[in-house]
């Protein structure tokens, strides 16, 4: 099974009860991986939220990924970590989490892309594909052509991130990309289960 296919990234603006409801419903709808992302909270709150998501995922095959924080991933024994370019180096993160955990890395330009295959990572988060309200600091948008180029450049699985919604999913899926990461299309949906089912249906 392709665990990267429909990759939910949580919204750190949502309270704990909403987070739990969204994740539970999204997994029922077919989400294949969940990344808990916290940019504003303290570590204790991050651990609490990560543990709550882990409890929801424990009887499923859906991996739990922690954004940025290796310490939080270790604290809750998550399935993996997703690093940004300004986070801990991938080589050090790999030493800390061990060989069997999933390690992802955000890639924002061609130089980082060419280096990626030499790093001890399992997948790439190609960011940002399109302009997005949740990623205000990205300097480059890859677009469809950039995504196609990246798929030809690296042997690693690619998860497309940034500005992805129902209008561009068919076009993205047609590139053969391994997975699509979404925040608002699922987290802000009235019915996250139905939204996940619908989004999966657009991926042909």
From Swiss-Prot:
2-[(2R,5Z)-2-carboxy-4-methylthiazol-5(2H)-ylidene]ethyl phosphate binds at residues 132-134, 163, 183-184. Keywords: Magnesium, Metal-binding, Thiamine biosynthesis, Transferase. Its cofactor is Mg(2+). 4-amino-2-methyl-5-(diphosphooxymethyl)pyrimidine binds at residues 35-39, 67, 106, 135. Pathway: Cofactor biosynthesis; thiamine diphosphate biosynthesis; thiamine phosphate from 4-amino-2-methyl-5-diphosphomethylpyrimidine and 4-methyl-5-(2-phosphoethyl)-thiazole: step 1/1. Gene3D superfamilies: Aldolase class I. Mg(2+) binds at residues 68, 87. InterPro entries: Aldolase_TIM (IPR013785), ThiamineP_synth_sf (IPR036206), ThiamineP_synth_TenI (IPR022998), TMP_synthase (IPR034291). Binds 1 Mg(2+) ion per subunit. GO terms for molecular function: magnesium ion binding; thiamine-phosphate diphosphorylase activity. It comes from the Bacteria. GO terms for cellular component: cytoplasm. One of its GO terms (biological process) is thiamine biosynthetic process. It holds the Pfam family TMP-TENI. It catalyses: 2-[(2R,5Z)-2-carboxy-4-methylthiazol-5(2H)-ylidene]ethyl phosphate + 4-amino-2-methyl-5-(diphosphooxymethyl)pyrimidine + 2 H(+) = thiamine phosphate + CO2 + diphosphate; 2-(2-carboxy-4-methylthiazol-5-yl)ethyl phosphate + 4-amino-2-methyl-5-(diphosphooxymethyl)pyrimidine + 2 H(+) = thiamine phosphate + CO2 + diphosphate; 4-methyl-5-(2-phosphooxyethyl)-thiazole + 4-amino-2-methyl-5-(diphosphooxymethyl)pyrimidine + H(+) = thiamine phosphate + diphosphate. It is an enzyme of class 2 (transferase). Condenses 4-methyl-5-(beta-hydroxyethyl)thiazole monophosphate (THZ-P) and 2-methyl-4-amino-5-hydroxymethyl pyrimidine pyrophosphate (HMP-PP) to form thiamine monophosphate (TMP). NCBIfam families: thiE. PANTHER family: THIAMINE BIOSYNTHETIC BIFUNCTIONAL ENZYME (PTHR20857:SF23), THIAMINE-PHOSPHATE PYROPHOSPHORYLASE (PTHR20857). Belongs to the thiamine-phosphate synthase family. This is Thiamine-phosphate synthase.
């Amino acid at each position: 099974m392709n665990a990267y296919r429909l990759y939910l990234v949580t919204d750190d603006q949502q309270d704990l009860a909403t987070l739990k409801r969204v994740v539970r419903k999204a997994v029922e709808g077919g989400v294949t991986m969940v990344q808990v992302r916290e940019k504003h909270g303290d570590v204790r709150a991050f651990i609490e939220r990560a543990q709550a998501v882990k409890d929801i995922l424990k009887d499923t095959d859906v991996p739990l990924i922690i954004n940025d924080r290796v310490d939080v991933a270790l604290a809750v024994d998550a399935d993996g970590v997703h690093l940004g370019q300004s986070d801990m180096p991938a080589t050090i993160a790999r030493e800390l989490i061990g060989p069997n955990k999933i390690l992802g890395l955000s890639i924002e330009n061609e130089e980082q892309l060419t280096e990626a295959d030499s790093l001890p990572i399992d997948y790439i988060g190609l960011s940002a594909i399109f302009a997005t309200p949740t990623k205000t600091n990205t300097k480059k948008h890859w677009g469809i052509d950039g995504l196609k180029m990246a798929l030809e450049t690296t042997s690693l699985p690619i998860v497309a991130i940034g500005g992805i919604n129902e209008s561009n999913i068919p076009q993205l899926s047609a590139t053969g990309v391994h997975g699509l990461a979404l925040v608002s299309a699922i987290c802000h949906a009235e019915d996250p289960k139905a939204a996940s089912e619908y989004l999966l249906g657009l991926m042909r």
